[in-house]
UniProtKB/Swiss-Prot annotation, chain B:
HAMAP family: ATP_synth_A_arch
Catalytic activity: ATP + H2O + 4 H(+)(in) = ADP + phosphate + 5 H(+)(out)
Family: Belongs to the ATPase alpha/beta chains family.
Enzyme Commission identifier(s): 7.1.2.2
Function summary: Component of the A-type ATP synthase that produces ATP from ADP in the presence of a proton gradient across the membrane. The A chain is the catalytic subunit.
GO molecular function, one term: ATP binding
Biological process, per Gene Ontology: proton motive force-driven plasma membrane ATP synthesis; proton transmembrane transport
Alphabetic keyword roster: ATP synthesis, ATP-binding, Cell membrane, Hydrogen ion transport, Ion transport, Membrane, Nucleotide-binding, Translocase, Transport
Compartment(s) where it occurs, according to its Swiss-Prot or TrEMBL record: Cell membrane
Record InterPro entries: ATP-synt_VA_C, ATP-synth_a_Xtn, ATP_synth_asu-like_sf, ATP_synth_asu_arc, ATPase_a/bsu_AS, ATPase_F1/V1/A1_a/bsu_N, ATPase_F1/V1/A1_a/bsu_N_sf, ATPase_F1/V1/A1_a/bsu_nucl-bd
Name used for this protein in its record: A-type ATP synthase subunit A
Residues where ATP binds: 235-242
PROSITE patterns: ATPASE_ALPHA_BETA
């Protein structure tokens, strides 16, 4: 390995070096500063005799006298089952004071695309115990379902609730028959979150014993921003190893993707690239896709990778490039809502703009319950109508509305108070969620339920609720 | 992707930046296919400046560095054409994904190449010419049963000079065996090649007059597309672009479907791969896959191959058109294609146009959509390519460059609407914004083949919907009850048009496909409600009583009524509506 002391330029996170041998694109670099600090970086551009390096740990202390070593390989993550229960920094080094990691394998963190022909279509229902998700936006194994949130909203609590409660109902029934193979594991990748938030997560993991089956990657707010581009890839490489080599069902929580995208923009700006929308690089869609698409199931493999990335929408604007590009890649989104939050609804999930694209194949007879699809459609339609009428009420008042309209308004209120607002501690199974849905739907006369199959109405309609409503 | 015969020249890598590589000392022409680096990654020449050749590479370039070799094949990006393309799934440069899976497992590795059609499969060749016949370019010389649905026609290649047939084979052959020989010495095989960026020639382009029947009420009923037409489906995420595209791929009455998943989700392509072999084609009853070719370049697959997948798809479509088939091509999503162009362009440091897209964006889009049309082929047959492109505008804002440049070309516009999607009104196609410029030229077909007053009834529905959107503005201010009774009634009728007719459940076994006869019948039921209700109103019946008859809600169930029962059901509902309303006065 040759060492160079030929740095010609340092600019933000980037270092330019002259070389006299060919260097591979994406290759890993070590830079040693005169005072002995070793920083790692990656080749961003390689020309004859000249390379651009992106330094992960910040370029502080790097000058023309620093020496540069090219390691001749791309960035690898050491993987082993023993990573479970460990806490690592954003570059994959242990920070929990535990023993060194003895890897089974070292895997390239960029990851290769799963051949669509080798994928298995996700259709195994994951019960999160949250009605707004299970009933209305069902999560399935192998899905990528982000939480679109805003600053100051309790997205962390929701993510923790899901991590705590997530289960697959069928398997509970036959728990011990299942060999250890299909155990559940959580890979947690934190990018640029505050130490306080990090503590919240860690406390919850420790309190509930979840840490034992988790791998935690921590890049905190004061850690180098460039490292954030590596953290999720480390996390996903670990998740893929656990899922496809060790048969775990892995839930990956990535928070906060907004910080990740900021880091991308920072690098793009340092490289003087032509910026795309709002200064984010033009390749951000491709870059994000390379993360999000690393969820899924593979034919013939036991395990699965399910992703719940969290992002805070700047200004609560879902047309901002970060949520916008994310929404185009992920299979739906769970939207947190500020108004619901200030009304004290927990979790403040607004189901109307939320969506799970894989829901339809994961629910129904044999999977959840035969009436699930129809109930959810009808709840959506009714809540949307009620919500729309609220605007009108503000202008004309309730009295000016018909009995039918008033009923929809009542429904919307009860839907939020009873169906959505369940608290972060309540774990509802899917039966409970659907029965609650029927109780609310039964506020309407049967003829209003045009999204529900007539047979299902006969089976589930709660008669006395309708009587009460008309009696009022 | 067709396999290169020989290496014409070799150069050396000078620099690498993502998918863009420059090489020196390479003698190449624009769009030549080259193999890059020690691993032989496939790429295409996109710029030549002095001694420096710029290449876009179709695979990941990690670890590739200066000094490694670049081999030029001297040929443009070319697809393999021949039997075996249907029932296949390809990546963006026509490498069969099932073959790649066999060779490198579940994850896509680099540097593996495979021909687009299996060269070892035996096909039963049935000649349609005999020795002594004169044939010219494009003529059919024989047929092969490619799938249960499709008879593959073996054509004299478009660039051939033709000649007299001197020898004809019949029986079982692989695609590279010669099946017909001409007096010019030309040998014709089932296997042909064609460069993807060049349109395959035809005699003439004609005005399309036949609809591509989609089985979707809002499309056939309000905004039809012609066989040979072009359509765009723009919409924000979650508004149902992919579901609409897939419904069209499943139920449109095309002979051949080419489905391009361009920069979209892996799981979506898997869904298609799993569903299509199971689902029956409503025209033939055979599995849908028997008429379908899939091209999957998912969002995490190399970006340069995303740029090429659109061309790969349309070239395959043109080849089947040459046989006289009606081909429907779905491109989901053309925005990802445009973004791939933008990404490559920005790596080349080209002067950007609007929003960073290259200045040639509009030209590329129109070149692509112009490859659609209703054509007269050289062999005398007529074939068509209908192109339906999804557009994913950032933030759902239709004023962005890809949507705008697409709208200047396409003649059908199906605008998806996030408000409708949030209310779970699917397909979430906004009836105020959408349009079809084919309506007038297709009406004669509907009149001849479905019903006489197809156009009149559609106009009635459009008028009611227009009136509704005007009234809705007033309702927003004063509430519904403040409106005069006749207007309240119009709103009620419009609600039935929306809920019983425009809405369609793509997941329901019956409702997902609605033949034009049923589309007409459901609407005629609502029209009866309209006419009878107004009769009753004129006779002095209060509007609450009119709207509370129990026959009307049954209209909402018509979508899910089986196709063979709907006629009787509609007739019965009409009769009951009439009876119940007339009882009121």
């Amino acid at each position: 390995m040759k060492e160079y002391q030929t740095i010609t330029e340092v600019s933000g996170p980037l270092v330019y070096v002259e070389t006299d041998e060919p260097i591979g694109y994406d290759e890993i670099v070590e830079i040693e500063t005169p005072n002995g600090d070793v920083k790692r970086g990656q080749v961003l551009e390689s020309s004859d005799g000249f390379v651009a390096i992106q330094v992960f740990e910040g370029t502080e202390g790097v000058g023309k006298d620093a020496s540069v070593r090219f390691l001749g390989e791309t960035l690898k993550m050491p993987v082993t089952e023993d990573l479970l229960g460990r806490v690592l920094d954003g570059s994959g080094n242990p920070i929990d004071g535990g023993p060194d990691i003895v890897p089974d394998d070292r895997v390239d963190i960029v990851g290769e695309a799963i051949n669509p022909h080798a994928r298995e279509y996700p259709e195994e229902f994951i019960q999160t115990g949250v009605s707004g998700i299970d009933g209305m936006n069902t999560l399935v194994r192998g899905q990528k379902l982000p939480i679109f949130s805003g600053s100051g909203l309790p997205h962390s609590d929701l993510a923790l609730q899901i991590a705590r409660q997530a289960s697959v109902p069928e398997e509970e029934a036959e728990t011990d028959d299942d060999d250890e193979g299909s155990e559940f594991a959580v890979v947690f990748g934190a990018m640029g979150i505050t130490a306080e938030e990090a503590n919240e997560f860690m406390d919850d993991f420790e309190r509930t014993g979840a840490l034992e089956r988790s791998v935690v990657f921590m890049n905190l707010a004061d850690d180098p921003a460039v490292e954030r581009t590596v953290t999720p890839r480390m996390a996903l490489t670990t998740a893929e190893y656990l899922a496809f080599e060790k048969d775990y069902h892995v839930l990956v929580i990535l928070t906060d993707m907004t910080n990740y995208c900021e880091a991308l923009r920072q690098i793009g700006a340092a490289r003087e690239e032509v910026p795309g929308r709002r200064g984010y690089p033009g390749y951000m869609y491709t870059d994000l896709a390379q993360l999000y698409e690393r969820a899924g199931r593979i034919e013939g493999k036991e395990g699965s990778v399910t992703q719940i990335p969290i992002l805070t929408m700047p200004g609560d604007d879902d047309t901002h490039p970060i949520p916008d590009l994310t929404g185009y890649i992920t299979e739906g989104q769970i939207m947190m809502n500020r108004d619901l939050n200030s009304q004290g609804v927990t979790p403040p999930v607004n189901v109307l703009p939320s969506l799970s694209r894989l829901m339809d194949d994961g629910i129904g007879e044999g999977l959840t319950r035969a009436d699930h699809g129809d109930v959810s459609d009808q709840l959506y339609a009714a809540y949307a109508e009620g919500e729309e009428l609220r605007d009108l009420v503000n202008i004309v008042g309730r009295e000016a509305l018909s009995e039918r309209d008033n009923r929809y308004l009542d429904f919307a209120d009860r839907f939020e108070a009873e169906f959505i607002d369940q608290g972060f501690k309540t774990n509802r199974d899917i039966e409970e969620t659907l029965d609650l849905g029927w109780e609310l739907l039964s506020m309407f006369p049967k003829t209003e339920l045009n999204r529900v199959d007539e047979d299902l109405i006969e089976d589930h309609y709660v008669e006395d609720v309708a009587d009460e409503a008309t009696a009022d | 992707m067709s396999q290169a015969e020989a290496i014409t020249d070799t150069g050396e890598i000078e620099s690498v930046s993502g998918p863009v590589v420059t090489a020196t000392g390479l003698d190449a022409q624009m769009n030549d296919v080259v193999y890059v680096g020690d691993e032989g990654l496939m790429g295409e020449v996109i710029e030549i400046e002095g001694d420096v050749t710029t290449i876009q590479v179709y695979e990941e370039t990690s670890g590739i560095g200066p000094g490694q070799p670049v081999d030029n094949t001297g040929e443009p990006l070319t697809v393999d054409l021949g039997p075996g393309m249907l029932d296949s799934i390809y990546d963006g440069v026509q490498r069969p994904l099932d073959v790649l899976e066999d060779e490198m497992g579940a994850f896509l590795d680099r540097g593996v190449d495979a021909p687009g059609i299996d060269l070892d499969t035996d096909w039963e060749f049935e000649p349609t010419v005999e020795a002594g016949d004169e044939v010219a370019a494009g003529d059919v010389v024989g047929t092969v049963d490619e799938t249960v649905s499709i008879e593959h026609k073996v054509l004299v290649p478009p660039r051939s000079d033709g000649g007299e047939v001197v020898a004809v084979e019949s029986g079982t052959f692989t695609v590279d065996d010669t099946v017909v020989e001409l007096d010019t010495g030309e040998e014709i095989q089932m296997h042909q090649e064609w460069p993807v960026r060049r349109q395959r020639p035809t005699v003439d382009k004609q005005t399309p007059t036949e609809p591509l029947v989609s089985g979707q009420r809002i499309l056939d009923g309000l905004f039809p597309i012609a066989k040979g037409g072009t359509a765009a489906i723009p919409g924000p995420f979650g508004s149902g672009k992919t579901v609409t595209q897939q419904s069209l791929a499943k139920f449109a009455d095309a002979d051949i479907v080419v489905y391009i998943g361009c920069g979209e989700r892996g799981n979506e392509m898997t869904e298609v791969i799993e569903d299509f072999p199971e689902l029956p084609d409503p025209q033939t009853g055979n599995p849908l896959m028997a008429r379908t070719t899939l091209i999957a370049n998912t969002s995490n697959m190399p970006v340069a191959a995303r740029e090429s997948c659109i061309y790969t798809g349309i070239t395959i479509a043109e080849y089947y058109r040459d046989m006289g088939y009606d081909v429907a091509l779905m491109a989901d999503s053309t925005s990802r294609w445009a973004e791939a162009m933008r990404e490559i362009s920005s790596r080349l440091e080209e002067m950007p146009g609007e929003e960073g897209y290259p200045a040639y964006l509009a030209a590329r889009l129109s070149e692509f959509y112009e490859r659609a049309g209703y054509f007269e082929n050289f062999n005398g047959t007529e074939g068509s390519i209908s192109v339906i492109g999804a557009v994913s505008p950032p933030g759902g804002d239709f004023s962005e460059p890809v949507t705008q440049n697409t709208l200047r070309i396409v003649k059908t516009f199906w605008a998806l609407d996030s408000d409708l999607a949030e209310r779970r009104h699917f397909p979430a196609i906004n009836w105020d914004e959408s349009y079809s410029l084919y309506k007038d030229q297709l009406d004669p077909w509907f009149t001849d083949n479905v019903v006489d007053d197809w156009a009149e009834q559609r106009q009635w529905a459009v008028d009611i919907l227009d009136e509704e959107s005007e009234l809705e503005e007033i309702v927003q201010l004063v509430g519904k009850d403040a409106l005069p009774e006749d207007q309240q009634l119009t709103l009620e009728v419009a609600r039935y048009i929306r809920e019983a007719w425009l809405q369609q459940n793509a997941l329901h076994d019956v409702d997902r496909y609605c033949p034009p006869e049923k589309t007409y019948a459901i609407l005629s039921g609502i029209k009866t409600l309209h006419e009878e209700s107004f009769e009753a109103l004129d006779a002095g019946v209060p509007v609450e009583e009119i709207t509370s008859i129990d026959a009307a809600p049954r209209l909402n169930r018509l979508g899910t009524t089986p196709d063979d029962e709907h006629e009787a059901e509609v007739a019965e509902i009409k009769q009951q509506i009439t009876e119940q309303l007339r009882e009121l006065y």
